């Protein structure tokens, strides 16, 4: 084929392999019915299969064993309908490796094939023996029809030659052998075979000798076949004898034919569910609880999903949900089938409506898959509501582990949000739990501000923010604890959803400003000159901190409140919190932390500092401030004079005068700051008050903390 045709081949393999191959070859008139030659006769078919049919070559063993299971299940159906009268005998599937011969053999005692069936199902690659069988036994066989055809040809990914030895269950059937070396040519001859069923013999090529190693085969069988409904035998059971392990006569069956999800929930105990979880994920903590899925319409789905205890070091790539099709392992990449917010769940989903060979684009577009995702969301919310209703105490005890699942679901799925409103919990700093409605009723009488907005106070660290929590509680307010990974986003969502409500962290402002009850004025307010002077005093005593900015403010808070309080701007802090867990917000993450250092002008110690500063510095500052006042008036006059004028219309003398005045003002302000800093440096009380505020916020560290302790001892 030309390069363009080969490219077309590769692109088609992404989605529905069987249908696409049919279309390509029908379009190019490559389908032929020539004896001794496969119906798809391109020389390139096998290289394409080897390279592109499956991303993982080890999938071949799943396909071959799955076909053996299908053949065995079909035999059981025929026996149940009376079409087979003979004894079924041993129905085990056997996998055997022969390193000397270089072969891997998968044998079954299923329905086998006649010469005509080999022609139809093996030689005509793009057709499936399941369709005809399904039509004939559609009332009974739907759940056991697998995918035949290209699945068999996956064996050529690891083999230089493949043989089929088969004898049909049909009376008088002749056993046949089919063989192919990976070219379009094949051979088929009559052979002697006494036992019904099929042997698939793979002559493993030199690049894939690993698939003859016992440990490698066992690993693959446990990965793909551990829950198949027909016993799969690989080797013999062993026992300890004469100082070593030796084989016994007992077959080693590697699979559990009736895993927990295939049984009725009424037949399972809690211990059964826990044991199955331990088998799936050895060595991790017991799950919080589980959900048993079972639906027949409009699609078939069974499974068990477990809610694990989430730890910071959990390996989400190791403990994934496993997807099965008729108990055959398909993948543990279940994006699109399981909603994103439930990807941290663990367990098993089994659905014959999801084919064995699926691509991500298929999962994203298939209507059944979308329905399955919606159904899982619904079942999870129903189960959570059920536990909440029946045992709220248990639900609250597990809330810290459940919280991340539920908040993520409410953030990402509108329908889940609607259902979860009834059982999502808010936890306060006293470790009490409330639903949204319960908490609203608790605080609406006391935490509604003058504008009618309900104010939800919250903390993110009970220890670090203790003084702020204590102040709020002393006013009769309740404070929520919102310290989860998703809480910044969850808070933002609740503010959008809940009417006339806002969330504020308890340290983001003074408590009387967080829940403002009225507009009040105070007699202790400072004038502009006092504010400028005291700003220099207090700012000079704030120790240098990396990526931190402080704005000094003066507020009358009451004589019994702290002399200085440090708060953090709510908006900027939220943006930085979200930047830590959300891409596209890196700009906010790089900004410095923004704090307000609020001096309580009602407190006696603050008033003492203000009065002492004015008294001690008055003689030095008065001439500077008087001169600065004159200079500022001159600057104001010159700026007014150049207003609405173009640059070339302003006299050069005025430009020079303005420049000189601005430089003079800068010089005078620097002198003022130096005087105030010198005074503050010599007045331990100023630095002590600042350090106390920093200490209460866990912001005093290293050398600054050591100096504070030494100064405290001296002052005592």
Where are these regions (language model features)?
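GHKL/Bergerat-fold ATPase module in large chromosome/replication-associated machines
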Residues: 144, 162-185, 205-209, 215-716
């Amino acid at each position: 084929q030309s390069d363009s045709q080969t490219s077309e081949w590769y692109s088609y393999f992404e989605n529905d392999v069987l249908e696409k191959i049919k279309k390509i070859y029908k379009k190019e008139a490559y389908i032929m019915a020539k004896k001794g030659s496969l119906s798809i006769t391109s020389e390139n078919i096998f290289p394409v299969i080897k390279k592109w049919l499956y991303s993982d070559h080890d999938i071949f063993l799943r396909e071959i064993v799955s076909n053996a299971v299908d053949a065995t299940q079909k035999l059981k159906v025929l026996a149940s309908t009376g079409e087979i009268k003979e004894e079924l005998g041993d129905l085990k599937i056997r996998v055997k490796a022969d390193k000397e011969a270089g072969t891997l053999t998968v044998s079954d005692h299923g329905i086998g094939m006649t010469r005509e069936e080999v022609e139809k199902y093996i030689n005509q690659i793009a057709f499936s023996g399941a369709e005809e069988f399904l039509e004939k036994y559609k009332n009974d066989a739907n759940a056991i029809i697998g995918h035949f055809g290209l699945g068999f040809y996956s064996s050529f990914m690891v083999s230089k030659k493949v043989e089929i030895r088969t004898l049909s269950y049909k009376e008088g059937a002749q056993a046949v052998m089919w063989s192919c070396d990976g070219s379009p040519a094949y051979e088929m001859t009559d052979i002697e075979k006494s036992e019904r069923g099929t042997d698939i013999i793979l002559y493993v090529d030199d690049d894939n000798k690993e698939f003859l190693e016992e440990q490698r085969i066992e690993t693959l069988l446990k990965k793909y076949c551990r829950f198949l409904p027909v016993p799969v035998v690989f080797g013999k059971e062993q026992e300890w004898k004469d100082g070593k392990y030796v084989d016994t006569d007992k077959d080693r069956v590697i699979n559990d034919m009736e895993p927990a999800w295939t049984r009725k929930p009424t037949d399972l105990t809690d211990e059964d569910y826990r044991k199955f979880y331990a088998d799936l994920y050895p060595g991790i903590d017991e799950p919080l609880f589980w959900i048993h899925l079972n639906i027949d319409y409009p699609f078939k789905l069974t499974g068990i999903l477990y809610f694990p205890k989430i730890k910071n070091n959990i390996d989400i790539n190791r403990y994934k949900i496993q997807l099965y099709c008729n108990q055959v392992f398909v993948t543990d990449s279940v994006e699109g089938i399981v909603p994103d917010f439930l990807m941290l769940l663990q367990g098993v989903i089994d659905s014959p409506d999801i084919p064995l060979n699926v691509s991500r684009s298929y999962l994203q577009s298939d209507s059944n898959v979308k329905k399955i995702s919606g159904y899982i969301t619904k079942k999870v919310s129903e189960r959570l509501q059920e536990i909440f209703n029946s045992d709220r105490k248990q639900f609250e005890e597990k809330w810290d582990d459940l919280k991340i699942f539920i908040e993520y679901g409410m953030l990402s799925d509108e329908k889940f949000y609607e259902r979860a409103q009834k059982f999502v919990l808010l936890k306060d700093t006293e470790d009490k739990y409330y639903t949204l409605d319960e908490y609203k009723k608790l605080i609406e009488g006391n935490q509604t501000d003058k504008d009618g907005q309900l104010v939800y106070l919250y903390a993110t660290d009970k220890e670090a923010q203790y003084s702020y929590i204590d102040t709020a509680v002393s006013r009769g307010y309740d404070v929520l604890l919102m310290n989860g990974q998703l809480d910044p986003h969850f808070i933002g969502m609740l503010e959008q959803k809940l009417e006339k409500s806002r969330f504020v962290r308890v340290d983001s402002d003074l408590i009387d400003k967080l829940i403002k009850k009225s507009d009040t004025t105070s007699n202790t307010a400072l004038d502009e000159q006092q504010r400028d002077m005291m700003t220099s005093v207090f700012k000079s005593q704030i120790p240098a901190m990396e990526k931190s900015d402080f704005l000094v403010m003066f507020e009358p808070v009451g004589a019994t409140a702290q002399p200085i309080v440090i708060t953090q701007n709510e908006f900027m802090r939220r943006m930085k919190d979200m930047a830590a867990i959300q891409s596209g917000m890196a700009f906010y993450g790089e900004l410095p932390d923004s704090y307000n250092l609020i001096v309580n002008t009602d407190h006696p110690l603050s008033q003492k500092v203000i009065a002492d500063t004015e008294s001690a510095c008055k003689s030095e500052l008065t001439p500077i401030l008087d001169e600065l006042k004159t200079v500022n008036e001159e600057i104001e006059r010159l700026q007014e004079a150049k207003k609405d004028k173009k640059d070339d219309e302003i006299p050069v003398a005025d430009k020079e005068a303005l420049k000189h005045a601005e430089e003079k003002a800068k010089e005078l302000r620097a002198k003022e700051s130096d005087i105030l800093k010198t005074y503050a440096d010599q007045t331990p009380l100023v630095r002590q008050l600042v350090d106390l505020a920093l200490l209460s916020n866990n912001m005093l560290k290293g050398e600054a903390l050591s100096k504070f302790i030494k100064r405290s001892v001296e002052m005592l």
